[in-house]
């Protein structure tokens, strides 16, 4: 589908508008006005005409189910606390990483930090990572400074066309967001996220994956998520198929805090962001069941935000992961030092990230939504979809819309898939229906966009109940 105006005009508009925006970052309480960009056309699945002569399989049973993959488990065990400690200490050693700090020194300021991150991606990338700076302008509170994201891309090798973005902002700040001279330690916020990002890149670069993975270190988050906005808007304009954006910000933990993480996803029950959050929670529970993911049905903490909001704004599925409890006394303070972080906690967050990213990147393609039709029997539905020849089976989800978690899945082998009837559902309940593909190692793809059936299906399918892309 063509756009009513040229892509060049849209890009020019975005760059001009970017210079006019400048509000506080993740640590302040004034929300940032979001840039209004052209709304993407509604996703239209490829034309699929069901085979009326195909055999219908009713209430199938399958032994092809999600399982712990030994190769992914081995990668998880490679996560090194020593590496994480070294990365956080290195980030703190730059003195400050404020967006307005020195860019020429080799040892102090944001310029030294970004060059070190760039070189570290090259060092750990096993010759597979394509590393580049993504430069952009930033104006904030009457000041301007050129900025750079550091982007490391691990191209997909299995024919997949999805892009998984794993991100963490590398800048920090003292109390004054424009103070580029004063010391700003920024160990947990967000040296911990950068450490996770680099350690994940080190481990995942040792393998090839079906989908493309982008490791994104963003700048100027503290002044208003400028770097994430620039990346997300350009990915949107370039028609990138971002299937997941995972934001890690302040994930280091401290001694004595509850052993879980919080996951923020806006409009969790009905949005694509919520679907990504459910997938994340499910895979995390499979691989690290003793380190729970607690779902937060919100874009972020009240009055706060992070880089993922820029991906939400352009319609890419995006979530934020953050430690279980924050210490407000450490926020934008020089007390936020490397020695207060719980590296066992940070290691477990990194392991969850590896499990989720490896399943998304190593599993089959995300299926297109099935056609769902009610049958004569109340509570019975027929699902029809094209079967991926690479898939070994499928998971089918009939999720009551008032439930934020997945129900018990129904499973079907590929040879029985494509025309499946499920019975025994409650005809008085509105369900969100989706499917995911499984490979022969038990890796689960992302779930298809949910289709709604039941008494209130029309309201949900029309999008009238949602306020986000």
What is each stretch, according to the model?
Residues 254-369:
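Active-site-adjacent substrate-binding region
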Residues 422-444:
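Beta-strand-rich modules
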Residues 391-412:
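Extracellular low-complexity, O-glycosylation-prone stalks/linkers
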Residues 83-155, 291-294:
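A non-catalytic alpha/beta surface segment that caps or lines the substrate-entry region
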Residues 438-465:
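Extracellular fibronectin type III
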Residues 379-391:
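Conserved aromatic anchor
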Residues 29-108, 124, 155:
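N-terminal hydrophobic or amphipathic helices/low-complexity stretches enriched
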């Amino acid at each position: 589908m063509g756009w009513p105006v040229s892509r060049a005009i849209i890009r020019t508009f975005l760059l001009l508008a970017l210079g006019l925006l400048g509000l506080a970052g993740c640590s302040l309480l004034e929300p940032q006005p979001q840039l209004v960009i052209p709304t993407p056309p509604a996703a239209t699945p490829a034309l699929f005409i069901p085979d009326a002569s195909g055999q219908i399989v009713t209430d199938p049973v399958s032994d092809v189910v999600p399982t712990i993959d030994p190769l992914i488990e081995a990668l998880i065990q490679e996560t090194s606390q020593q590496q994480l400690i070294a990365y956080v200490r290195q980030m703190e050693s730059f003195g400050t990483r404020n967006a307005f700090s020195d860019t020429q020194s080799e040892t102090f300021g944001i310029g030294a930090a970004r060059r070190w991150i760039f070189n570290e991606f090259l060092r750990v990338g096993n010759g597979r990572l394509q590393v580049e700076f993504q430069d952009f302008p930033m104006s904030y509170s009457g000041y301007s400074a050129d900025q750079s994201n550091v982007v490391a891309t691990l191209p997909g090798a299995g024919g997949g066309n999805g892009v998984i973005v794993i991100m963490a902002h590398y800048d920090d700040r003292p109390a004054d967001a424009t103070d580029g001279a004063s010391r700003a330690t920024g160990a947990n916020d967000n040296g911990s996220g950068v450490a996770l990002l680099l350690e994940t890149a080190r481990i995942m670069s040792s393998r090839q994956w079906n989908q493309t993975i982008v490791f994104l270190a963003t700048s100027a988050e503290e002044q208003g998520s400028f770097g994430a906005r620039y990346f997300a808007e350009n990915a949107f304009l370039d028609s990138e198929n971002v299937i997941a954006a995972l934001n890690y910000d302040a994930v280091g933990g401290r001694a004595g805090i509850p052993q879980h993480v919080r996951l923020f996803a806006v409009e969790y029950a009905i949005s694509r962001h919520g679907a990504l959050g459910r997938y994340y929670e499910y895979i995390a529970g499979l691989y690290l069941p003793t380190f729970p993911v607690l779902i937060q049905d919100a874009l972020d903490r009240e009055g706060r935000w992070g880089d993922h909001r820029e991906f939400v704004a352009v319609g890419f599925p995006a979530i934020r992961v953050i430690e279980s409890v924050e210490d407000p006394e450490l926020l934008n303070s020089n007390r936020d030092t490397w020695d207060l972080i719980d590296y066992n906690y940070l290691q477990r967050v990194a392991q969850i990230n590896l499990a989720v990213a490896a399943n998304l990147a190593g599993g089959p393609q995300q299926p297109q939504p099935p056609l769902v039709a009610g049958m004569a029997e109340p509570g019975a539905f027929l699902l029809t979809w094209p079967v991926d020849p690479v898939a070994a089976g499928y998971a089918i989800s009939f999720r009551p819309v008032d439930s934020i978690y997945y129900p018990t899945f129904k499973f079907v082998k590929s040879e029985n898939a494509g025309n499946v009837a499920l019975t025994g559902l409650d005809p008085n309940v509105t369900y969100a229906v989706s499917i995911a593909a499984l490979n022969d190692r038990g890796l689960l793809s992302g779930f298809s966009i949910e289709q709604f059936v039941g008494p209130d299906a029309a309201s949900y399918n029309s999008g009238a109940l949602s306020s986000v892309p």
